[in-house]
Design a protein with these regions (language model features):
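Surface-exposed, interaction-prone regions used to assemble/regulate multi-protein complexes
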Residues: 1-196
Length: 196
């Protein structure tokens, strides 16, 4: 069966609606990888599609991909398709050697211009939350795992919930987590990217 997804409508998860989440991820398939950046809080962001200048005057000279995939504060793993190397962040046990932010950005282990072949959401049962795996044409793989819930500090009760991972696109912002929650908010103006 063929399905049409209207990316101009706001959508929120129906419990157990993994297919709806998968449909929103489909917009990333076929897009070329441009570069990786480590942002505030050591969050990994991958940039895809056409490069665009940042909209904020404070970020003048910085480029962003039309699609920006962010790990937020979640653990992630990048497996290179061309090298016997794996990068990890925020995984227990700290396997391997530390990598500087600059080294990661200079060598993200994913070949520039390799295309996204698959973007697959899955449920991580112990965390009762969504993870995601991106597969690239160079054989590389990115996997983002949800952040495990911790005991809430009463002072944190007023803070908004932080997504486990997000995809900003020309169509809008897909936010996933915490838990099995997710939402898609369309861009407010035609052609406006949700970040930058």
């Amino acid at each position: 069966m063929t399905n049409l997804i209207d990316l101009h409508k706001t959508r929120a998860a129906i419990p157990g609606d993994l297919s709806g989440l998968q449909s929103d991820l489909a917009q990333l398939v076929g897009e070329p990888f441009r570069f990786a950046r480590v942002s505030y809080g050591d969050e990994l962001t991958l940039h895809f599609g056409d490069l665009r200048p940042a909209k904020s005057p404070k970020l003048k000279g910085k480029l962003y991909g039309a699609y920006v995939f962010g790990s937020r504060g979640s653990p992630w793993i990048v497996k290179s398709g061309s090298q016997s190397l794996v990068l990890t962040a925020d995984l227990d046990g700290h396997p391997g050697e530390p990598v500087r932010k600059e080294d990661l950005e200079a060598n993200p282990l994913i070949a520039p211009d390799s295309r996204v072949l698959a973007a697959t959401a899955f449920v991580v049962k112990p965390a009762n939350a969504h993870g995601v795996e991106l597969r690239f044409s160079d054989g590389s793989t990115l996997r983002i795992l949800p952040t495990l819930a911790e005991a809430d500090d009463p002072a944190d009760a007023a803070l908004p919930a932080l997504a486990d991972w997000e995809l900003a696109s020309p169509a809008g912002l897909l936010s996933v987590g915490p838990g099995l929650t997710w939402s898609f908010a369309p861009s407010t103006r035609s052609g406006e990217q949700a970040t930058g």
